[in-house]
Amino acid sequence: KGKNFKWKLLQNSPNTINAILSEKKLIKKWVSEYDLSGIISDNRLGVYSKKVPSVFITHQIRVMSGKTTWISSKIHQKLIKKYTECWVPDVEGFPNLSGKLGHVKKFNGNLKYIGVLSRLEKEIVPELYDLMVIISGPEPQRTLLEEKLIIELNDFSKPVLFVRGVIESEQIITRSDNIVFYNFMTSEELQKAFNYSNKILCRSGYTTVMDLAKLEKKAFFIPTPGQFEQEYLAKMYHEVNIVPTASQDDFVISDLKQIDSFRGLPKFKNEINWKQLFALFKGK
């Protein structure tokens, strides 16, 4: 599975290079056309300019790719150094959320750790669901996990909210015994759903991890097979007794009992000095 993922990355590399070149061409035009004061790139490697301060946002200073991690990381770091600053959505010290992904010993780039970022807010509301299942990621793995979990949940009697992660023209809500199914949710609905739920069963993508930390929710992770970043994060949290995990093939519903014996994600007080951060663009 890991080999298949790397092969797909290799196949997509011409598309990635073309995308970077297209972004650079567009940015060059925009800088002069709109008199830009600066650029903030959310993980887009072609979105920068030498003429104005340019910031790259990423939690991956080290890019996990199995045996080729060292070279994928070096390439990524070289591209990051083209930017004036790199903002990492994590804390610099320990404990942190990104582990080796966002923390490297030797890097000459201008890194700034800006704290854990999430658009969601913790709410004090009644608990409506014992378990929230939220599925995401590429096909066919999304469908394979959905089908597996529906079977496993036959042995789960408590209230469940199941978000399938399928974006369609209309929202569809169905009910089956103790489970409420949504094909997708808006950001506002997701915030309420997370807050209404006792525990979360989901992938271990970094955005989801930050959301769970912000909401102080306990979880169980099933990383997307072959996605090295998710597999690394899930393994790291499991080994330090923060969040339990299982592979997609091995997971059984009784594994959820482990959640209570794990500490849960650390709490962070985010005190981002936005004025200080954006001073980079002042007078440009």
Where are the regions that the model predicts?
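Conserved nucleotide-sugar phosphate-binding/catalytic loop shared by glycosyltransferases and other
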Residues: 1-15, 180
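Leloir-type glycosyltransferase catalytic cores
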Residues: 11-16, 242-284
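Conserved nucleotide-sugar donor-interacting segment of glycosyltransferase catalytic cores
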Residues: 23-87
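Short acidic active-site motifs
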Residues: 26, 75, 188-192, 208, ...
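A nucleotide-sugar donor-handling region in carbohydrate enzymes
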Residues: 58, 63-140, 164-168
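Donor-nucleotide binding loops and adjacent catalytic segments primarily
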Residues: 101, 115-199, 209, 231, ...
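Hydrophobic acceptor-binding patch used for acceptor engagement in glycosyltransferases
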Residues: 199-200, 218
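Catalytic binding pocket for nucleotide-activated donors in carbohydrate/polymer assembly enzymes
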Residues: 208-209, 213-263
